[in-house]
Amino acid sequence: MNISILLPTRKRLDLLKKSVQSLIDNARQPDKLQFLFAVDEDDNKTFLYLKQSKYPNQLALQFKPIGYENLHKYNNTLAGYATGKWIMFFNDDAIMKTKNWDDKIMDFEDEFCLLRFKEQTGHPYSIFPCFPQKWFYLLDHISLHGQNDAWLSEIAYMLNIMRDVDISVIHDRADITGNNNDETFRLRKYNEGNPEQKGDLHHIDMVKLRYKDALKINWLLGLMGQPNEFIIKNLENKSDPFILLKEKFDVYKKAGAVGAGKQNARVTDQREIKVSYSNLSKD
């Protein structure tokens, strides 16, 4: 199996069909994809459909509804069933546009990194993260917070292992395109933007947990013959391990910071986190 696709979905069957079909139609080897779906128990329509659908190597799991703020729990569970060399997040409101996108991912097979697709907002995070299966095997989780893309991306920037890849995805989300302003979108809850509040993405406890993940991955990189001193040098020199992320956010801000519904973390130094919305502050 080449790529395992994690796809939590809630009461968006028509969107889900369109999203999955875009991945299949544009893949060179769709038979080497694995589709892993998470469906809430109160979304029987979607689950019944997936019970009879025949997507490549599919598995659908039912969950008690735990909300968007616990998206990581859906994804961490699905990842335990992943058999692909790469694990990838996708959304039911996302459309793959690039032909042979699966080949472009496999081109990175010899490198341990986080892949960042192109999407119309230009957000510095990898909005649809794609990473080696070993990432999950090492940590026994993908994220410990509902903002999965932010969790993974901040680790990747700390280690300088974020890699842009020429794969384009349309994120057809209400605050970006004006489409799909449904209940699923409106009821989303972000635990982000209040770093003094326990459970927030940038509460000190969460920051420390990401550092632990990053240092474990750094250890693995050395074992794999891909030594990486980026984070170690920054910590030893008491310099900013988030400098690469800050530079990306500067570009993002100048471009207009599209997608106001997405809260954007702005890291000021290795110990202090400031958060704003789409109008990122200078400091």
Task: List where the protein language model places each region.
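Short aromatic/hydrophobic "clamp" motif used to bind/position activated sugar donors
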Residues: 87
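Short, well-formed alpha-helical segments that are part of the catalytic scaffolds
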Residues: 12-27
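Glycine-rich, basic loop-to-helix element that forms the pyrophosphate-binding segment
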Residues: 65-82
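C-terminal catalytic/acceptor-binding lobe
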Residues: 150-283
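Aromatic-glycine-rich donor-binding/catalytic loop that engages nucleotide-sugar donors
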Residues: 131-148, 155-165
